[in-house]
Amino acid sequence: MSEAIGTLVYAVVKYAAYSAWCLAGLAVARPGGAGGGAALRFGAIRWAIGLAFGVAVFVLVGSIDASAAARTYFLVYSPVRVVEWSIMAWLIRDRSRPLSTALILWCAGGLLVSFLTDLLSPEGLQGRFCVGRCLC
């Protein structure tokens, strides 16, 4: 598979995973109040947030030593993804209800979704860590 096709497949998988996870988040945040269309929109928003943060990481982190890639990947992306999923929780939550433990746990699950889908990136499929260009 060419790198361009691999990147496109990865982007689509990332979007699908984010949309599915946003559907779960909507069920937690707005029981009975939102469906698949909203999940697709929130999935697109989450994907775009990840792309923007990914470009920023690429610019700010710059070149890294290959021997430190795994450490750098987790040190950089763990807090970035906490911010990204917190933004999503703020966007999807029903503001008439208090913030719930379930929504906080949904954010934690979102971090896991983000990291697991990175395994399907072109770099991840080659056993490497992507830092700054993996669509967060």
Please report, for each region that a protein language model flagged, where it lies by residue.
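Juxtamembrane/disordered regions of integral membrane proteins
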Residues: 1-136
